[in-house]
Amino acid sequence: MKKSIYEKMQILADSAKYDVSCSSSGSDNNYKTGELGATHNSGICHTFTADGRCVSLLKVLFTNHCIYDCAYCINRKSNEIKRAAFNPRELADITINFYKRNYIEGLFLSSGIVRDEDHTMRLILKALKILRQEYRFNGYIHVKLIPGADEKIIEEVVSLANRVSSNIELPSDKSLKLLAPNKTKEKVLQPLKYARDISLEKETKPIGMSTQLIVGATPENDKDILKLSSVLYDKALLKRVYYSAYIPVNDDKNLPAVITKPPLLREHRLYQADWLLRFYDFTYDEIVNDENPNLDEEVDPKTFWALQNLQYFPMEINTVSKEELLRIPGIGARGVYKIIKARRFKSLDFEDLKKLKISIKRAKYFITCKGKYQKEVSFYKETIKEAIIKPPKKKIIQPSLFDMDYSAITGEL
């Protein structure tokens, strides 16, 4: 029976929700009858551009038919699920109509593999050509490249898209062989290498590229994951690595049970560590190593690093370099800028930092101001960590309805 456009949209938007390269919510509160609003992470989602703008995207698969049988994927060949596929004209028409109604500002397009990699990529390319050349659509387009597709097809897709990606999914070749035998790391990364080389040859602004790693489906530790991310960044292959806490959708002896909860906190810590790699000049083996191969879920990665390296602390806030300031837990790039600017005129103390609107809730355990260290806890790893995890409870004071000092003087309420 032929499916309507509405049915196809329902199926293919829902099938795309597990790709976190574009997602607007980590919540699973679904729509309830009689209530307003929902937090679905499928359909229209949000992402951020390089200049910080938040854009709404239609997040959808071209098709959820697939010749692959990856154990972790809801769209695997052996799963008995509802299947659908757009044709290029249908997808282009939906996108342009959503855009004209101001529902979206762009398109996030992924796909299962139908027939073979080249055939699927050609269908996607045809949809992009209709959008860009026929409809003159100049909005944002993010396309998932199909590993194994021909280089010439990829070149055309890259010329029409704003961002491309190819998901590695699993951090090691061993796990890929076990759970996704049709894929290898080299095969997945090859389209991104093509895209990078094409951008460099044309001497234009390099196209943004990203990948996704699933966290918690296989036994790899955080060191394995961050090492891979670091290598990909160092090779200038990627602008961003996304981490996706594994959501069990299939029963498989090689995967966690379906009732297993996604490791969301671990995913969050990996994103924080990834930020340190990209913007704070940390190396992966500074954050995690053979002795501590996994991040501490109780504290953020910068605090975790600081607690393992107390020999560098406490740092004197008035004399240390910009690079050293960036390594102090709780002080970010904007805080460092404020400190460097302010200390040109005076030596700073703890009160000065508060006046600069710099939170010292964590930083105070790792710094001195004018040679003075905070007196709340002793300078030991265990006591500092405990103080950070379990801060002292503040005494709750009932706020007064009136300004008591003013009332006492004037007699007014």
Regions found by a protein language model. Name each.
Residues M1-H65, S359, I367, K375-L413:
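Flexible, acidic/Gly-rich N-terminal and inter-domain linker regions that tether
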Residues L57, C70, L109, S166, ...:
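Conserved, mostly hydrophobic/aromatic
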Residues L58-V60, R89-K100:
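Short, charged beta->alpha transition segments
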Residues V60-R89:
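Canonical Radical SAM [4Fe-4S] cluster-binding loop centered on the CxxxCxxC motif
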Residues A92, I96, R115-I287:
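Conserved AdoMet/S-adenosylmethionine-binding subsite of the radical SAM
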Residues N254-L326, R362-L413:
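Long, highly charged, low-complexity intrinsically disordered interaction regions
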Residues A342-R343:
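Residue-level signature of tetratricopeptide-repeat
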